[in-house]
């Protein structure tokens, strides 16, 4: 395999959704990441541990496919890591500005104190009426 793609699901999603992308990305190994994080600060620890483990095993080039809040968590947790490419599906890119959502104080403080600096080549797919992206 030339590229390992880690699928990061959205809220209420599952790592099994990775199966949908295997047929679309021949030549890539697509792996579903079964994360438990419910906040960006939990994702920072959990995602970093998982991705650093892959890198230490010499897995070669690593990319991500991330959906909705999974994309936001990925950008928070993996911004400084060596990621070859990212594919985002209806990503939440700014948690503070989601229409109709009021963040609790802890989330708001986190978002303001941890601006995202994402420098990974990224492809974004979203629907015409998507109001989260």
Language-model features, listed with the residues they occupy:
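Acidic catalytic loop of the alpha/beta-hydrolase fold
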Residues: 13-14, 128-133
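Active-site nucleophile loop of the alpha/beta-hydrolase fold
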Residues: 35-38, 87-97
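Conserved alpha/beta-hydrolase fold motif
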Residues: 61-64, 86
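Gly/Ala-rich beta-loop-alpha elbow adjacent to hydrolase catalytic centers
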Residues: 65-74
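Aromatic pocket-lining residues of Rossmann-like dinucleotide-binding sites
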Residues: 77-81
């Amino acid at each position: 395999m030339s590229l390992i793609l880690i699928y990061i699901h959205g809220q209420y999603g599952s790592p099994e959704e990775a199966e949908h992308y295997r047929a679309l990305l021949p030549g890539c190994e697509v792996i579903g990441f079964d994360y438990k994080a419910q906040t960006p600060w939990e994702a920072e620890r959990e995602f970093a541990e998982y991705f650093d483990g892959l890198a230490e095993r010499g897995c070669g080039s690593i990319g991500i496919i991330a959906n909705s809040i999974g994309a936001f968590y990925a950008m928070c947790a993996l911004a400084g890591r060596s990621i070859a490419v990212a594919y985002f599906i209806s990503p939440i890119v700014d948690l503070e500005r989601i229409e109709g959502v009021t963040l609790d104080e802890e989330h708001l403080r986190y978002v303001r104190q941890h601006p995202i600096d994402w420098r990974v080549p990224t492809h974004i797919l979203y629907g015409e009426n998507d109001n989260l992206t």
